[in-house]
Amino acid sequence: MALKIRLARGGSKKRPYYHVVLADARSPRDGRFLENLGSWNPMLAKDDEKRVQLNAERIKHWIEHGAQPTDRVLRFLDEAGVAKREVKNNPVKAKPGKRAQERAAEKAQKVADAAAAAADAAE
């Protein structure tokens, strides 16, 4: 059974509240879970100590037994010092797309042509 440590949504409409749960990867998001491992209340201030509450001992136990935390839960665990999250580096992401690069090249060519024409006219 593939186990995941993930978020299960609770709360009402526009007032989210999440439980950090251990669940089978195939079960629904808010469906059956094996153990409740903590909570996250995004409505609280970021510096509030009750915003993220984790049972670190049980989380370590389940990670040792093969449970995989989701990306968001892994961020919480990294902040709490329970697990290490690898920093993702994608330098290609910042580059514009192919069409945008073509348009920029065309625009630069037009500017260069206009500058050359102005220089010829000035002579």
Swiss-Prot record:
Family matches, as InterPro entries: Ribosomal_bS16, Ribosomal_bS16_dom_sf
Biased composition (Basic and acidic residues): 99-110
Cysteines paired by S-S bonds: none
First and last residue of the signal peptide: none
Domain of life, per lineage: Bacteria
Gene Ontology terms, MF aspect: structural constituent of ribosome
Coiled coil: none
GO cellular component: cytoplasm; small ribosomal subunit
GO biological process: translation
Key words of the record: Ribonucleoprotein, Ribosomal protein
Low complexity biased stretches: 111-123
One Pfam family of this chain: Ribosomal_S16
NCBIfam families: S16
Family of this protein: Belongs to the bacterial ribosomal protein bS16 family.
Protein name stated in the entry: Small ribosomal subunit protein bS16
Organism listed in the record: Rhizobium johnstonii (strain DSM 114642 / LMG 32736 / 3841)
Gene symbol of the encoding locus: rpsP
